[in-house]
Each structure stands twice: as C-alpha cells, then as structure tokens.
Amino acid sequence: MRIAALPPVIGALAASLALTACATYPEEDTGSASCGYDSRDWKAWVNAMPGPGRNGPTLYITGEVDMPTPGWSLTLVEGPADRMQPPGLRFRLETERPGGMTTQVITPTEVRYAQTTRYHEIREIIITCGGEALATIDDVPVAH
C-alpha cells in the first residue's frame, strides 16, 4: 500500500520542481546603467533677451547620455543653488526605464532642459545621478 502511494507523491514533487523552475528572475540591478554608461556634449546657456510673454531669463541645458537600451526617459530636476555670486546650480538626472521588452543595445539619448530662472548669471552647473557627479559645466554664457 505504501508503494502504491509513492508514485503520486513523486509526481507532485516533480510538478512542483517544474513549476519553480519557471519562476522569473528578480529584476537585475543595473547599477550605474540607470545613470548611463557615459555622457558627453553638455552645454548650458541663459537667454536673457527681452520679449513678449517672457517672464525673465531662461536657462537651457543639453547633453547626451549613453543608456543601456532605447526608450529611456531622462529628466533634469533643479536642485539647490550655492550662495556664491554668481551662483552654481545643481541638477539631478532622473531616469525612467522603458516599458516592455527592448533591444539590448547602448543608445545615445538626448537630455534637454529649458525653464525660467531667477539667475541672470550662473557660475557653474553640476549634474548628478545616483549621488555621483555626472558632469560639470563651467562655461554658462548669457545671451542679451
């Protein structure tokens, strides 16, 4: 009787092992990949030219970051300014993964920022991601 009961137990054990083999892997920690592999061509300028509908000077920042796949969304978020005159500004690069499956190919991705600023002159801009400095822009010209 015990021998007859053994095959269903073995079958249940085999089925549970097969199902656990189908479990998904935990999402990979891409580490610095979420901040990109490399970045380049960072530029910033202040447009202080007067005009209709303008509420003051506008700060523009552009750059390019190599991301691990196509479809990443990159956003610059303004942080604190230091107390020097002219001030230095800090920005944090926020990244958002693409949804669904994507091709695994390093993709240069453009970053753009354009917002009104209260500063007519800026000494430097430091861009960080994941707590590390990604880029420092020392030359921020002003267009009058």
List where the protein language model places each region.
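A short, structured loop/turn motif at beta-sheet edges
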Residues: 54-56, 79-89, 116-121
